[in-house]
A protein has these predicted regions:
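Second-shell loop/turn segments in exported
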Residues: 88-92, 205
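Generic helix N-cap/helix-start motif at coil->alpha-helix transitions
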Residues: 3-14, 23-29, 38-49, 59-64, ...
Length: 229
């Protein structure tokens, strides 16, 4: 993103460094968000992810959403990153996300199921969960007519299989009902819109998340990514 109002990189770097020395994570994060938005360097993303991951009280879904974005921008580097990311996806019940993460780790020659027994077990568990995912989707489809939460979950599962339009439809249907996590549904909608190339609408969805929500920091990360995409 370029423009007349673009802040100077060196000044942002200096300010975030000062806030880091002061242990002021809120203002440091604000500076890092601007560095990522305007300059997008891998180190800025990495530092911003570190702050996000250190936030207390994140749910399994929120932690996984950070992993998803780290994968997209190339912040998963070592075997532990990919293994932890895949485990997060399994815990949150998105086995195809776990498969995607493990496949990327294999392609990057960071993971090797043939020589690492731990990776081999994780790959097998993931493949077994993916094989059983059809039944899970069928169950959610049945529930979704009367359960808004099931509809949003189904939409996110569709999204992990690149069924983007079906995902959007399911999430929107769920948002019409009573949800346990309405702010999370807004992030889910943003995902489905961004996947279809609807960037302005996706940004609006991410930005609509309440600032007081635990989803707020995750939504800001995705909003920045969508604005740069």
């Amino acid at each position: 993103m370029q423009g007349n109002t673009q802040p100077r990189e060196d000044l942002l770097q200096f300010q975030q460094s000062v806030y880091n020395e002061m242990n002021d994570s809120v203002n440091r994060r604000n500076m890092l968000e601007q560095l990522v938005l305007y300059y997008g360097k891998p180190q800025y993303w990495h530092d911003l992810f570190q702050l996000a991951r250190n936030e207390k009280g994140l749910s399994d879904e929120q932690q996984l959403d950070i992993v998803r974005l780290r994968l997209l921008v190339g912040d998963l580097k070592v075997a532990g990153d990919f293994i932890e990311g895949a485990q997060s996806a399994l815990v949150a019940d998105y086995p195809n996300d776990a498969k995607t993460i493990l496949d990327k780790g294999n392609q990057a020659k960071v993971l090797n199921a043939a020589t690492d027994e731990r990776v081999g077990r994780l790959v097998k568990m993931t493949n077994d969960r993916v094989a059983a995912d059809g039944a899970k989707q069928a169950e959610l489809q049945q529930k979704s007519a009367s359960d808004a939460n099931a509809s949003v979950k189904l939409g996110l599962i569709y999204w992990t299989y690149a069924k983007h339009k079906e995902a959007e439809t399911a999430v929107r249907a769920g948002m019409k009902g009573k949800l346990a996590d309405p702010e999370g549904a807004k992030v889910a909608l943003g995902h489905t819109l961004l996947s279809q190339g609807n960037k302005p609408e996706a940004v609006n969805a991410f930005n609509s998340v309440a600032r007081t929500s635990k989803w707020a920091s995750v939504a800001r990360l995705w909003s920045i990514y969508a604005r740069r995409a």
